[in-house]
Regions:
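Internal alpha/beta scaffold segment
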Residues: 204-207
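FAD-binding subdomain of flavoenzyme oxidoreductases
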Residues: 198-202
Length: 207
């Protein structure tokens, strides 16, 4: 089914982000909404700057990514990084003129901001000790990383009726609270087999 013009305009708002940067122009009301698809949230009236939410699938980062994020924070944002409940990272006080550079540098280290806000599938979470838990049934990191790439690159997963959460749990000592997500996937042992139990319709916060 063809995508709506509305969705295409939101996902393809990058050109407008670049145009606004030339004059350090704050986004108008419509652009504020559209730029959320690129993970940029305008902080007005508090500040004439953006907050950006990064997608960190499973909350896993490489050391070189952390180093570059520290440089970005010091050079073109507020100087600090926030961690969210879904293992995202948030960076604040990005001026409109710095937004394109910010996005370029984030993508250059293999990270993304697209779809981290608005009505899209949010960051995938998993148990924090995945891959190192001595009693886990299965390491769910490969599943989380693969599905995250599919979501980022498939436009049919954007512009949903509401934001959508997915979590994986490998059945180890520390859980991912997967049952509070719209889709929760947990490894379970049935006899000699390791299977996935899928729970649907979980929620946190508002109803």
């Amino acid at each position: 089914e063809p995508l709506s013009i509305h969705l295409l305009a939101d996902v393809d708002a990058y050109e407008q982000i670049v145009e606004n940067a030339i004059g350090n122009k704050s986004p108008d009301k419509e652009e504020i909404f559209r730029f959320k698809w690129h993970g940029l949230f305008f902080l007005t009236p508090m500040k004439e700057a953006f907050m950006s939410r990064l997608r960190i699938p499973g909350g896993v980062l490489k050391s070189y990514q952390l180093r570059e994020l520290a440089h970005i924070a010091q050079q073109i944002t507020s100087g600090y990084v926030q961690v969210t409940t879904r293992a995202n990272l948030q960076m604040r006080l990005i001026r409109p003129k710095d937004a394109p550079e910010f996005l370029h540098r984030i993508q250059a280290i293999g990270l993304h901001t697209r779809g981290s806000g608005a009505d899209n599938i949010r960051n995938l979470t998993m148990n924090p000790t995945a891959g190192v838990d001595p009693v886990e049934l299965i390491d769910v990191q490969p599943f989380v990383q693969q599905i995250a790439q599919v979501i980022i690159n498939d436009r049919s997963f954007y512009d949903l009726p509401r934001k959508f959460n997915i979590a994986y749990d490998g059945g180890g000592l520390i859980g991912s609270v997967e049952d509070t997500n719209d889709i929760g996937v947990k490894a379970v042992k049935v006899g000699d087999e390791i299977l996935f139990r899928i729970a649907l319709g979980g929620a946190t916060g508002h109803k």
